[in-house]
Each structure stands twice: as C-alpha cells, then as structure tokens.
Swiss-Prot record:
<dbReference type="InterPro" id="IPR005811">
    <property type="entry name" value="SUCC_ACL_C"/>
</dbReference>
<comment type="subunit">
    <text>Heterotetramer of two alpha and two beta subunits.</text>
</comment>
<feature type="binding site">
    <location>
        <position position="102"/>
    </location>
    <ligand>
        <name>ATP</name>
    </ligand>
</feature>
<dbReference type="GO" id="GO:0000287">
    <property type="term" value="F:magnesium ion binding"/>
</dbReference>
<dbReference type="GO" id="GO:0005829">
    <property type="term" value="C:cytosol"/>
</dbReference>
<feature type="binding site">
    <location>
        <position position="107"/>
    </location>
    <ligand>
        <name>ATP</name>
    </ligand>
</feature>
<feature type="binding site">
    <location>
        <begin position="321"/>
        <end position="323"/>
    </location>
    <ligand>
        <name>substrate</name>
    </ligand>
</feature>
<dbReference type="InterPro" id="IPR005809">
    <property type="entry name" value="Succ_CoA_ligase-like_bsu"/>
</dbReference>
<dbReference type="InterPro" id="IPR016102">
    <property type="entry name" value="Succinyl-CoA_synth-like"/>
</dbReference>
<feature type="binding site">
    <location>
        <position position="99"/>
    </location>
    <ligand>
        <name>ATP</name>
    </ligand>
</feature>
<dbReference type="GO" id="GO:0006104">
    <property type="term" value="P:succinyl-CoA metabolic process"/>
</dbReference>
<dbReference type="GO" id="GO:0006099">
    <property type="term" value="P:tricarboxylic acid cycle"/>
</dbReference>
<dbReference type="GO" id="GO:0004776">
    <property type="term" value="F:succinate-CoA ligase (GDP-forming) activity"/>
</dbReference>
<dbReference type="InterPro" id="IPR011761">
    <property type="entry name" value="ATP-grasp"/>
</dbReference>
<dbReference type="GO" id="GO:0042709">
    <property type="term" value="C:succinate-CoA ligase complex"/>
</dbReference>
<keyword id="KW-0436">Ligase</keyword>
<dbReference type="GO" id="GO:0004775">
    <property type="term" value="F:succinate-CoA ligase (ADP-forming) activity"/>
</dbReference>
Amino acid sequence: MNLHEYQAKQLFAEFGLPVPEGYACDTPQEAFEAAGRISTAKKVVKCQVHAGGRGKAGGVELHDTKEGVKEFAQKWLGKNLVTYQTDANGQPVTKILVEEASNIANELYLGAVVDRATRKVVFMASTEGGVEIEKVAEETPELIHKAAIDPLVGPQAYQGRELAFKLGLQGDQIKQFVKIFMGLGEMFTQYDLALLEINPLVITGEGNLLCLDGKINIDSNALYRQPKLREMHDPSQEDKREAHAAQWELNYVALDGNVGCMVNGAGLAMGTMDIVNLHGGKPANFLDVGGGATKERVAEAFKIILSDDNVKAVLVNIFGGIVRCDMIAEGIIGAVKEVGVSVPVVVRLEGTNADLGRKVLAESGLDIIAAESLTDAAQKVVAAAEGK
C-alpha cells in the first residue's frame, strides 16, 4: 500500500524529522485559507497522487498569492493527473498539498528498502538528489552509499555518521542527518514498511536539512496490525479491477493487451503470459486465482477480466495439484453461464483428474475451446483474439 506525500510527511514529523509547514486540502477554499496561514512569500502547491513525475505534468507549481493557490486547486481537484508513471487516464486528484517554499542550496537522496539478497533493511544515500535513484544506480552506481541494518540491534548512530561523511556533510549537518537516519530506521520497523524515500532531502540556504518530499510503501501483508496506516488507504488511487480482485483474494494486475489470462499459481501465471507473448499475443492482465479456485472465485475472476473492454479472448490455464481439474471444470462452466461470457474461452487443464475435467467441459454444450498443451493453448487463444 502506498501513501501520499502529505501522509508520509505526517509520519516524518511524528518521528521528529524536519518537514516544511504544509496543509492537505480538499477544496479550493481550504487551499486559499491554508496559503494564508503560511508565512513564506511563495507557496508550493502539489497534486497528491500515487505517481512520480508530477512537476513535469503540471501538478506542482510555485505561487506568490493566495488567489494563485486557489486557482491551482480549482484547476486540479476532481481532475486526473497524467504523468509518465500513470496510464493514459492518469490518477484522480482529490487532495492538494499547500506548503511553504524552501530555500534550496543542495539536494540529496535518502531511502531504505528491504534487500532480499542480504535479508536486511538497507539504507541508501546519494549526493544525486532530485533525480530517480534507478537512473543513478544505472549510470553512476558509485555515487550510491549503503548501510545494512542488523535486525537484532537496529540502526546505529555510527552508520548514520558514515553516510553523512560520504555525502560531504559537515558540522551540525551530521547531527541532523543522524537524527533523520535513526528516525527513519525506527519508523521502517515500527510501521512494517517495504520502502521509503526522501527525494530530495535538501540542504537549505541556512545549512539545515529538510525532508522536501516523501514516498512510503507499506507491506500489505502487515496491514492487519497497522490500524493507523489502514485508515490512510486511498482507494481512489487504485485500479478498480485490482481493488475488486483484492476483495476476493485474487492477485490481479491490469496490463494493456487483449488476451485475458486466468491461472492458478503466480509462477504458472507468469509463464502463461510469456508464452502468449511468444506466440504473438499480448496479455491483458496477470491473474492468479490461487489454490482455492472455487466456482465463486472463478466467476469473479471472469467478471474482472471481462470488465476490460480490450479483452478479445480468455485463456484459462489450470494445473490441478491440490485442486481437482474436474472440480475446476465445473467451476468454469458455472462461471461462464453466470457471467455470460461473450468472448472465446480457451481452457488448458493438467494434473489431477485432467482427463475427467476435459470431458466435463466437452459435455457442457458451451463454446469452450479445449487445449492439449500450453503451446496449443497459447496458439489457440492468440488466434481467437485475432478473430481467426
């Protein structure tokens, strides 16, 4: 689960990290009033969406007057912001962050992520703030400095000092950086984070450190024990189909192809997408129905897949390990009848009772195309999607 910038800064402030004075606003009038409470001559206004690239898309502006701030809010609230990280429809803007402008002398990067290679939380710091860390890692990896956190003892002040030295900080800046580092380390563990970034972490004209932006991603598997963070969830930023899938414990990711895929098992689902692509098709989604592929879940999976108007054919690829293929076949038949599927459906069954499952499908009287192998299934569904 992702947080908005204003929510990330609220958490930063909770742990004593320096953030600009700012207010999240729901209406143009609130934005106008918030601008009046900010003492700096210039105010920064930012659209709050779960996507980067807001500045280049016009979603971040600098204004001298309260009226200018209000006009910005009127322009964007209720609209969609399209950036290079969103799809063509963009993300809806339901809040505007109005905050004081900062006097920036230099920009740094500070972030933390769960590193599966070391099985530790790893902090990353760089002098190349304000740009994507992935770009820095690709072009100048030597400019990224790391500190792995021992889970038994947590972040240590000496690690923060080492990073501060490598960033070229001096004097009181080192103490400020260590405080930020320790606060983020505590926050990462306490709130079950998967990733956090301050980009940029700026050095102001007065020589102080300031968290100018914030990005936080929470481990969704831990949300059951994070009631405070659950309340910060913004469903408007999620794909409606993905949200629907989550309610049924289906793993769904929307893509831009025309072949719907329904598979049990994440690895098999990825392999299915690969072979569809290999035979000239384009997957419209990733969908893993998991081990409990009941009639109800299969029906919901069909509904989700077919809610995408781009889908011209559906490939159902099931390996019967724990579940029996004949039961899956009955679920598919029931789901097709209930949903009223109007596009070609190709089904490949393998594993426990696969022959019986294929027989059940053949005797159903429905227009379901049986496939003998994964290659056969991919070829048939690609042809069906092309109307052949």
